Regions:
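Surface-exposed edge beta-strand/loop patches
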Residues: 62-64, 148-214, 349-352, 367-384, ...
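Periplasmic OmpA-like peptidoglycan-binding domain that tethers envelope proteins to the cell wall
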Residues: 281-358
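Bacterial lipoprotein signal-peptidase II cleavage site
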Residues: 35-44
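Extracytoplasmic low-complexity, Pro/Thr/Ser/Ala/Gly-rich segments
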Residues: 44-117, 121-124, 133-134, 190-244, ...
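The feature marks short-to-medium sequence segments in extracytoplasmic or secretory-pathway proteins
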Residues: 85, 99-151, 267, 402, ...
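Second-shell loop/turn segments in exported
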Residues: 147, 245-254, 288-292, 484
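N-terminal secretory signal peptides
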Residues: 1-15, 19-33
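Periplasmic peptidoglycan-binding/anchoring modules of Gram-negative envelope and division proteins
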Residues: 222-235, 245-279, 303, 307-308, ...
């Protein structure tokens, strides 16, 4: 069935208007307004809906999820603090309702909101809580994976669990719906709904290993390939490509080296001091002894040059070389050997990082688009690459600046013949290795099906969606959709959520690069950034 591009988002009494990022949306006098292509405005500050008026909670929010060619109404929150058998945790009530005209006789609505088969195979699930100010993420701890299907007009009450939350408000990443700010309340708060805590926890079977929040991390790559940077809460790590900064088998800095090192120096100069570790690495072409010496010499050359570009007096320095002993990737291809020839600079400020992105200073220009390009609100129509597999239109009206993040909800609509393949296989995913994420970590199925290829082009850098690493997991996941298995028919629509680091710009450029087995490059320009 075809779905409308408009959707109604209302607040409950007692809740701030700054609650929901909706698409399509416009900033209008008096509030945040959503509108459809026909221009009919829908004001998010409207009176409570009938469903909200009948609810016992005065702090829940009506939202809409658009996926699988259907529109689902979801009553969200508030997040409720509870205790059970001496353990503190939180429960997020979600009441999901299908429309009366739903096409399918039954639908697993829980899989849309909580994740389906691929998510059940691991710890990562699409439903998450975000603290944009503190750069933290809570993943739902729910282990339950089997739910009753829902027919047209039917409803399902879900009670996913999370660990304890110490914030007053959090932003819910509601898969295929948006970013919804909800209050966090105690169980005895007048705004809290009545909950059967024992039953909710018994059904959820919470995973204790996922109780604690994890840090949001930021990854960027210079467009000229000279550097890549990763920022966590404690440190910033910059890989400087040796092929740019040094000649072959040499420890003498090239004339182009400063293009890479100035950006590193600016990052260091933004902090008052701390620990600075500079480590050289090589490929495995020469013998061990030669590579060890070369890596040490290159690390020293970088340290000396950084000391001339910025004051390192307040930094405790460690300069060393690892030779070929710690490759970033396998040395079995030229591309792999090139990645391993690097000098790693780890900046650990005494008071931690300030969530700032690592920015290069090389002056590389934004490359020409290799696929369809349009302004974000207009939308770009994309064919299925060289193989001609389907067609979709990608649209992004705006992104919301909240805390240290930019939050976007893209609208994906099937074109002539539809998408033909799942949205997570080429249309929106990172076009690198099939099961690997952008860092080269083996990610499994939820890496394959994620919309982790939605990058920003800013200055001289390509900036990836923020990501995070759950306990006992070996690979990071992007703060975006994780299980895009749906295949859109002609006219069917799905919404896709994604969070990026704040670039500090008034408009952004979203770029899905070429590459991979199913290359589908496209670009959206002039996407407004609005305060949230």
């Amino acid at each position: 069935m075809s779905t409308s591009s408009s959707y109604h988002l209302t607040t409950r009494s007692g809740l701030s208007r700054r609650v929901v990022l909706s698409l399509p949306a416009l900033v209008a006098a008096g509030g945040l307004v959503a509108c459809d292509r026909g221009g009919a405005a829908i004001d998010s500050s409207a009176s409570p809906s009938a469903s909200s008026a009948s609810s016992s909670s005065q702090a829940a929010i009506d939202a809409e999820v658009v996926a699988t060619g259907e529109s689902l109404t979801v009553v969200v929150g508030p997040l409720v603090r509870v205790s059970h058998r001496g353990a503190d945790l939180t429960i997020l009530p979600l009441d999901v309702t299908r429309s009366e005209d739903g096409a399918a006789p039954t639908l697993d609505v829980a899989a849309v909101v909580l994740g389906g088969t691929a998510s059940a195979l691991g710890a990562y699930r699409p439903l998450r809580l975000i603290d944009p100010e503190g750069s933290r993420v809570w993943s739902t701890t729910i282990a339950q994976s089997t739910f009753d299907p829902v027919g047209p007009g039917g409803s399902l009450a879900l009670h996913p669990t999370f660990g304890p939350v110490d914030a007053d408000t959090v932003t819910v990443l509601l898969s295929h719906g948006g970013f919804i700010e909800v209050p966090v309340v105690d169980a005895d708060d007048a705004r809290a709904p009545e909950l059967d805590v024992v039953s909710a926890i018994a059904e959820s079977s919470p995973q204790d290993s996922l109780r604690d929040p994890v840090t949001v991390e930021r990854y960027s790559v210079a467009l000229d390939g000279s550097t890549s940077g990763l920022t966590t809460g404690d440190e910033t790590s910059v890989d400087v490509a040796s092929d740019v900064t040094f000649a072959v088998d040499s420890a003498e800095l090239t004339a182009q080296a400063d293009n890479a090192l100035k950006g590193v120096a600016e990052t260091i100069g933004g902090y008052d001091g701390g620990d600075l570790t500079i480590t050289g690495h090589t490929d495995d072409v020469a013998d061990d002894a030669h590579n060890q010496t070369l890596s040490e010499q290159r690390a020293r050359a970088v340290a000396d040059r950084l000391g001339r570009l910025t004051d390192l007096g307040a930094w405790t320095q460690t300069v060393t070389g690892k030779g070929e002993s710690e490759p970033k990737v396998a040395n079995d291809t030229e591309e792999g050997r090139q990645a391993n020839r690097r000098v790693e600079v780890v900046i650990a400020p005494t008071d931690g990082t300030d969530d700032a992105l690592v920015r290069s200073a090389g002056g590389a220009e934004i490359p020409e688009a290799t696929g369809p390009t349009a302004k974000g609100p207009d939308g770009a129509t994309v064919g299925g690459g060289a193989l001609g597999l389907g067609q979709v239109t990608v649209r992004l009206d705006q992104v919301l600046r909240r805390g240290s993040l930019l939050l976007g909800v893209l609208e994906i609509t099937g074109g002539k013949s539809g998408s033909l393949t799942p949205l997570g296989t080429g249309w929106l995913s990172d076009p690198g290795s099939v099961l690997n994420n952008v860092r080269g970590e083996l990610g499994g199925a939820t890496s394959l099906l994620a919309s982790d290829g939605l990058t920003l082009l800013s200055g001289s850098d390509r900036i990836y969606p923020v990501d995070y690493l759950l306990p006992e997991s070996s690979a990071h996941r992007a703060l975006t959709e994780l299980e895009l298995t749906e295949i859109l028919a002609d006219g069917q629509t799905s919404r896709v959520c994604v969070a990026w680091p704040d670039t500090g710009e008034d408009t952004v450029m979203v770029d899905h690069p070429a590459g991979g087995a199913l290359p589908c490059p496209w670009r959206l320009t002039d996407v407004p950034v609005v305060a949230g």
